[in-house]
């Protein structure tokens, strides 16, 4: 359903976020909100319309640790996405490895995902990369569960 910007919506967005919305009809609310914003997110779902997300300026990073881990890198490569994944045994004071061998047998360059959560600046190098996240332990987490959760 199409959304028409109204003065109430305009005022709210302008006062809350400092974003000016041109008065026009929008195809969806998300298209209206994305003017002046740079939305990004992580997703485990591989059935998203990644082409439409890119067209709308909605930056997505795939997340390791779901039921689609067996094909997540195929999807990442097809759509030019990176994959965020926890790594085991890397202390906060140590750098993440330069590359990680994924379960598909391929070696991928890494980005230190703990430096910032802002994935939009990661850029595209022509190949997917692993956004390496140091494992944050949770109460009751066994070594076996921790290792199973991590990509490497």
What are these language model-derived features?
Residues 1-152:
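Class I S-adenosyl-L-methionine
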């Amino acid at each position: 359903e199409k959304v028409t910007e109204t003065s109430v919506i305009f005022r709210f967005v302008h006062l809350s976020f400092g974003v000016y919305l041109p008065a026009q009809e929008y195809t969806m609310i998300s298209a209206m909100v994305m003017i002046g914003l740079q939305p990004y997110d992580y997703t485990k779902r591989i059935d998203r319309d990644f082409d439409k997300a890119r067209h709308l300026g909605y930056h997505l990073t795939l997340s390791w640790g779901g039921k689609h881990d067996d094909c997540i890198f195929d999807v990442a490569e097809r759509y030019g996405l990176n994959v965020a994944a926890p790594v085991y045994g890397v202390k906060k004071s140590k750098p993440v490895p330069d590359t990680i061998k994924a379960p598909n047998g391929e070696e991928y360059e890494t980005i230190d995902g703990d430096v910032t959560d802002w994935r939009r600046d990661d850029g595209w190098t022509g190949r997917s990369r692993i956004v390496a996240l140091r494992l944050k332990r949770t109460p009751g987490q066994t070594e076996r569960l921790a290792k199973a959760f991590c990509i490497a």
